[in-house]
Protein backbone atom coordinates (compact mmCIF):
# COMPACT_ATOMS: atom_id res chain seq x y z
CA UNK A 1 0.00 0.00 0.00
CA UNK A 2 1.34 3.42 -0.95
CA UNK A 3 1.72 6.19 1.59
CA UNK A 4 -1.46 8.17 2.07
CA UNK A 5 0.44 11.42 1.55
CA UNK A 6 1.61 10.31 -1.90
CA UNK A 7 -1.91 9.32 -2.92
CA UNK A 8 -3.27 12.65 -1.62
CA UNK A 9 -0.58 14.57 -3.51
CA UNK A 10 -1.49 12.76 -6.73
CA UNK A 11 -5.19 13.48 -6.18
CA UNK A 12 -4.37 17.17 -5.68
CA UNK A 13 -2.46 17.15 -8.97
CA UNK A 14 -5.47 15.63 -10.74
CA UNK A 15 -7.68 18.40 -9.39
CA UNK A 16 -5.24 21.08 -10.61
CA UNK A 17 -5.05 19.49 -14.06
CA UNK A 18 -8.85 19.50 -14.30
CA UNK A 19 -9.08 23.08 -13.01
CA UNK A 20 -6.60 24.53 -15.53
CA UNK A 21 -7.43 22.26 -18.49
CA UNK A 22 -9.47 24.79 -20.49
CA UNK A 23 -7.12 27.71 -19.75
CA UNK A 24 -4.06 25.67 -20.80
CA UNK A 25 -5.83 24.65 -24.01
CA UNK A 26 -6.66 28.28 -24.89
CA UNK A 27 -3.16 29.54 -24.10
CA UNK A 28 -1.58 26.82 -26.24
CA UNK A 29 -3.89 27.67 -29.14
CA UNK A 30 -2.92 31.37 -28.88
CA UNK A 31 0.76 30.54 -28.50
CA UNK A 32 0.98 32.56 -25.28
CA UNK A 33 3.79 30.58 -23.68
CA UNK A 34 4.74 33.28 -21.18
CA UNK A 35 1.37 33.09 -19.41
CA UNK A 36 1.39 29.31 -19.76
CA UNK A 37 4.74 29.21 -17.99
CA UNK A 38 3.30 31.17 -15.03
CA UNK A 39 0.63 28.54 -14.32
CA UNK A 40 1.30 26.06 -11.50
CA UNK A 41 3.64 23.24 -12.47
CA UNK A 42 1.29 20.61 -11.13
CA UNK A 43 -1.43 21.78 -13.53
CA UNK A 44 0.44 20.09 -16.38
CA UNK A 45 -0.98 16.65 -17.23
CA UNK A 46 2.51 15.27 -17.85
CA UNK A 47 3.21 15.42 -14.11
CA UNK A 48 0.46 12.91 -13.36
CA UNK A 49 1.38 9.29 -12.76
CA UNK A 50 -1.01 6.40 -13.19
CA UNK A 51 -1.56 4.73 -9.86
CA UNK A 52 -3.35 1.55 -8.92
CA UNK A 53 -6.90 2.34 -7.75
CA UNK A 54 -6.71 -0.50 -5.21
CA UNK A 55 -3.26 -0.15 -3.65
CA UNK A 56 -1.93 3.19 -4.92
CA UNK A 57 1.16 1.53 -6.39
CA UNK A 58 2.74 3.76 -9.08
CA UNK A 59 4.58 1.08 -11.05
CA UNK A 60 3.34 -1.87 -13.08
CA UNK A 61 -0.14 -0.42 -13.62
CA UNK A 62 -2.36 -1.96 -16.32
CA UNK A 63 -4.14 0.92 -18.07
CA UNK A 64 -7.26 -1.00 -19.03
CA UNK A 65 -8.03 -2.03 -15.45
CA UNK A 66 -6.29 0.83 -13.58
CA UNK A 67 -4.72 -1.76 -11.28
CA UNK A 68 -1.19 -2.83 -10.54
CA UNK A 69 -0.13 -6.19 -11.88
CA UNK A 70 -0.14 -7.61 -8.36
CA UNK A 71 -3.65 -6.42 -7.47
CA UNK A 72 -4.90 -7.51 -10.90
CA UNK A 73 -3.56 -11.02 -10.38
CA UNK A 74 -5.15 -11.32 -6.93
CA UNK A 75 -8.55 -10.08 -8.10
CA UNK A 76 -8.46 -12.16 -11.28
CA UNK A 77 -7.75 -15.36 -9.33
CA UNK A 78 -10.67 -14.61 -7.02
CA UNK A 79 -12.93 -13.98 -10.05
CA UNK A 80 -13.67 -10.38 -9.05
CA UNK A 81 -12.90 -8.90 -12.48
CA UNK A 82 -15.71 -9.56 -14.98
CA UNK A 83 -14.64 -11.20 -18.22
CA UNK A 84 -11.18 -12.19 -17.01
CA UNK A 85 -10.21 -15.79 -16.50
CA UNK A 86 -6.97 -17.69 -16.35
CA UNK A 87 -5.93 -18.98 -19.75
CA UNK A 88 -4.83 -22.52 -20.44
CA UNK A 89 -4.06 -24.33 -23.67
UniProtKB/Swiss-Prot annotation:
Protein name, as recorded:
Small ribosomal subunit protein uS14A
One annotated GO molecular function: structural constituent of ribosome
The subunit field of the Swiss-Prot or TrEMBL record says: Part of the 30S ribosomal subunit. Contacts proteins S3 and S10.
A single GO BP term for this record reads:
translation
Which InterPro entries does the protein's record reference?
A: Ribosomal_uS14 (IPR001209), Ribosomal_uS14_bac/plastid (IPR023036), Ribosomal_uS14_CS (IPR018271), Ribosomal_uS14_sf (IPR043140)
Belongs to which family? Belongs to the universal ribosomal protein uS14 family.
**Keywords, in A-Z order:** Ribonucleoprotein, Ribosomal protein, RNA-binding, rRNA-binding
One Pfam family from the UniProt entry?
Ribosomal_S14
* Function of the protein: Binds 16S rRNA, required for the assembly of 30S particles and may also be responsible for determining the conformation of the 16S rRNA at the A site.
This protein's GO cellular component annotations are: cytoplasm; small ribosomal subunit
Amino acid sequence: MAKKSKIAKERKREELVNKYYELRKELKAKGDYETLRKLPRDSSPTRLTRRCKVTGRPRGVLRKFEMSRIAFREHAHKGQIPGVKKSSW
